[in-house]
From Swiss-Prot:
Name of this chain's protein: Putative F-box protein At2g11200
Domain F-box: 5-51
PROSITE patterns noted in UniProt: FBOX (PS50181)
One Pfam family named in its UniProt record: F-box
Stretches that traverse the bilayer: none
Native organism: Arabidopsis thaliana (Mouse-ear cress)
UniProt superkingdom: Eukaryota
Length: 154
């Protein structure tokens, strides 16, 4: 008798992307550490665009992610618009999904300033010698110079 099981790595690329695009945002970190191929797939810009497009259409533009600066730290926030009445009053809920931290510093990174330019967040850190770091929100890739901290969302 033949074994009819199929490993995830044996799936066609389109089907694999479809499966990975259904993973909840909160579980993406666990999925990324499962295998190198999945991590590469999740890091690709094409997949990220497809993932965002799918999540936008699924929530009908009533739920989105935002990055907010609070108390010298950057937070990834999930914003859900519950209701908009006839007078454009909005009922919404905001939930913190993650905080931008330094890999070397468990307490976090103190950010002085954030500038958004061409789909890139440029952050200036508050230290003895301020450092500039760039964060590309679509792929969560960190663009840094050699003197900059390593940053990630937790």
């Amino acid at each position: 008798m033949r074994d009819l099981t199929t490993a995830m790595s044996d799936l066609p690329r389109d089907l694999e992307e479809e499966v990975l695009s259904r993973v909840q945002l909160a579980s993406l970190r666990a999925v990324r550490t499962t295998c190198k191929k999945w991590n590469r797939r999740l890091s690709k810009y094409r997949f990220t665009k497809k993932y965002i497009r799918k999540s936008r259409s699924a929530t009908a533009d009533k739920e989105f992610l935002a990055i907010m600066m609070l108390d010298s730290s950057l937070y990834l926030m999930n914003v859900v618009i519950d209701k908009i009445d006839n007078e454009n009053n909005v009922e919404s809920s905001i939930e913190r999904k993650g905080k931008l931290i330094s890999v070397n510093d468990a307490d976090g990174v103190d950010i002085i300033s954030v500038v958004h330019y061409n789909a890139l967040l440029l952050c200036l850190t508050k230290e003895k010698t301020p450092k500039a770091c760039g964060l590309e929100p679509l792929s969560w890739a960190i663009k840094v110079d050699r003197n900059c901290l390593s940053l990630r969302f937790i």
